[in-house]
Amino acid sequence: MSDIITAFILGIVEGLAEFLPISSTGHLILVGHLLGFEGERAKTFEIVIQLGAILAIAILYHKRLVSLCNIKPLLRKEKKFNAFHVFLGVFPAVVAGLLLHDIIKTYLFQPYTVVIGLVAGAILMIFAEVKKQEATSYSLDDLTYRQALTIGLFQCLAVYPGFSRAGSTISGGLLAKVNYKTASEFSFLIALPVMVGATGLDLLKSWTYLSVDDIPMFAVGFITSFIVAMLAVVTFLKLLEKIGLKPFAYYRILLAILFTVFVLL
């Protein structure tokens, strides 16, 4: 299979899976294994296509991101979504990521650990659906600092490969009495700084594996993941309010079984 086709397929996988509660890591490892695209070059490629998905969110939520630069609501102590909400949502995962980055990359990016993450994340999502209570926050401006911090703490679970950032944060939001749409949007916003930091750190360590010959392949993957991520996020927000997290949880369990059959056995 040509590099361009491989890039196109993996770009679609990344764009679909990055911001959905189904684990982009698990999908990329499984599909990469089936395509025979593995090793350091593959890891560097995954970093690049993640940047495409990140850019999609940055564009979709550019107005909200720009508004976070306005510190007046924060200084006036207005009950309005502001940069401190994002800080509370980001800080726990940043600390966890910095402390555990090398351990995670060395020991946890293994097929069997990803299977554990897929199943554990599915259990959390089902638990959140069963235990969720009537929402008190129906928009980002309703979000309290306590709710933001709670979701931020749940984001720490996503440092474990296969757990899913969206799955853990949306579950945390439901348990903190935040509705689906608001939990999802906050999940996307707090994912940006964490992903930019983690991806940037990985890219600094991996850029030596790149060559000029890789540019066409990496460009196709980047553009594909960007376009697909934009479409996936818009569709997901509409779908989630209708079907909830359980179908995604069941899909994760199915993926864990497929992962075990095709990768581990």
Swiss-Prot record:
<dbReference type="GO" id="GO:0071555">
    <property type="term" value="P:cell wall organization"/>
</dbReference>
<dbReference type="GO" id="GO:0009252">
    <property type="term" value="P:peptidoglycan biosynthetic process"/>
</dbReference>
<feature type="transmembrane region" description="Helical">
    <location>
        <begin position="4"/>
        <end position="24"/>
    </location>
</feature>
<feature type="transmembrane region" description="Helical">
    <location>
        <begin position="217"/>
        <end position="237"/>
    </location>
</feature>
<keyword id="KW-0133">Cell shape</keyword>
<dbReference type="GO" id="GO:0050380">
    <property type="term" value="F:undecaprenyl-diphosphatase activity"/>
</dbReference>
<keyword id="KW-0046">Antibiotic resistance</keyword>
<keyword id="KW-0961">Cell wall biogenesis/degradation</keyword>
<comment type="function">
    <text>Catalyzes the dephosphorylation of undecaprenyl diphosphate (UPP). Confers resistance to bacitracin.</text>
</comment>
<feature type="transmembrane region" description="Helical">
    <location>
        <begin position="42"/>
        <end position="62"/>
    </location>
</feature>
<feature type="transmembrane region" description="Helical">
    <location>
        <begin position="108"/>
        <end position="128"/>
    </location>
</feature>
<dbReference type="Pfam" id="PF02673">
    <property type="entry name" value="BacA"/>
</dbReference>
<dbReference type="InterPro" id="IPR003824">
    <property type="entry name" value="UppP"/>
</dbReference>
<feature type="transmembrane region" description="Helical">
    <location>
        <begin position="245"/>
        <end position="265"/>
    </location>
</feature>
<protein>
    <recommendedName>
        <fullName>Undecaprenyl-diphosphatase 1</fullName>
        <ecNumber>3.6.1.27</ecNumber>
    </recommendedName>
</protein>
<dbReference type="GO" id="GO:0008360">
    <property type="term" value="P:regulation of cell shape"/>
</dbReference>
<keyword id="KW-1003">Cell membrane</keyword>
<keyword id="KW-1133">Transmembrane helix</keyword>
<keyword id="KW-0573">Peptidoglycan synthesis</keyword>
<dbReference type="GO" id="GO:0046677">
    <property type="term" value="P:response to antibiotic"/>
</dbReference>
<dbReference type="GO" id="GO:0005886">
    <property type="term" value="C:plasma membrane"/>
</dbReference>
<keyword id="KW-0472">Membrane</keyword>
<keyword id="KW-0378">Hydrolase</keyword>
<feature type="transmembrane region" description="Helical">
    <location>
        <begin position="184"/>
        <end position="204"/>
    </location>
</feature>
<feature type="transmembrane region" description="Helical">
    <location>
        <begin position="84"/>
        <end position="104"/>
    </location>
</feature>
<comment type="similarity">
    <text>Belongs to the UppP family.</text>
</comment>
<keyword id="KW-0812">Transmembrane</keyword>
